[in-house]
Design a protein with these regions (language model features):
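Glycine-rich beta-alpha junction loops
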Residues: 3-8, 28, 36, 58-60, ...
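Active-site-adjacent helical/loop segments in soluble small-molecule enzymes
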Residues: 38-94
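A conserved regulatory-domain signal marking ACT and ACT-like small-molecule sensing domains
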Residues: 107-166
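Short, hinge-like loop/turn segments at secondary-structure boundaries
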Residues: 15-21, 71-73, 116
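Catalytic phosphate/nucleotide-handling subdomain of diverse soluble enzymes
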Residues: 87-115
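Glycine/threonine-rich beta-strand-loop-alpha-helix active-site module
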Residues: 1-21
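N-terminal glycine-rich dinucleotide-binding loop that anchors FAD/FMN and/or NAD(P) in oxidoreductases
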Residues: 17-31
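Flexible, glycine/charged-enriched surface loops at secondary-structure junctions
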Residues: 11, 57-58, 74-78, 151-158
Length: 166
């Protein structure tokens, strides 16, 4: 089985040997975020499941970016749990099926996941510099970024921030 670390109620229940209720839950996989697993399904899971892999939100962000970039698919976070879990398993030489489900995401959430995924992988980052208010200083920074094969996605420039206002 697999569930998010921030809502690992089944894992906690299996470890306790009984259904337990978590005090709180916190995960981006809201489709599977439950404090208490179902009492009717618990005995079946307890009897038939080898274990539960807990996936943190960072792993879900990475899985989202992988699926979007490599397969051009939008899969909601709960549906990505099985993809993220594959990195925890040794299945070399075996056939594996992973069910991808749900694409119910708004574009702001998609944008946020892409940005966090790129940041997590070191593909984008933010930096801040204070420059003298002279012509060419901004060009000097842009040239430095370009020489490193970088690209500037967003630039905030306030030439008045350094003025001495005594």
């Amino acid at each position: 089985g697999v569930e998010p670390t921030g809502a690992a109620s089944m894992k906690a229940s299996l470890e306790a040997g009984r259904v337990v209720t978590l005090d709180k839950i916190s995960t981006i996989a809201d489709g599977v975020a439950v404090k208490t697993p179902g009492g009717q399904v618990f005995p079946y899971i307890q009897k038939n499941l080898d274990g539960v892999i807990a996936i943190d939100d960072g792993e879900l962000v990475d899985a989202f970016l992988d699926v979007m970039e490599k397969h051009k698919m939008v899969v909601e976070n709960a549906g990505l749990l099985t993809i993220a879990a594959l990195k925890h398993l040794d299945f070399q030489g075996q056939n594996v099926v992973s069910v991808l489900s749900g694409g119910n995401m708004d574009v702001i959430t998609i944008s946020s996941l892409v940005q966090h995924g790129l940041i997590n992988r070191g593909r984008i980052f933010t930096f801040s510099v204070q420059l003298p208010d002279r012509p060419g200083e901004l060009l000097r920074i842009a040239d430095l970024v370009a020489r490193q094969n970088g690209n500037i996605i967003k630039l905030d420039h306030n030439q008045f921030v350094n003025i001495n206002r005594q």
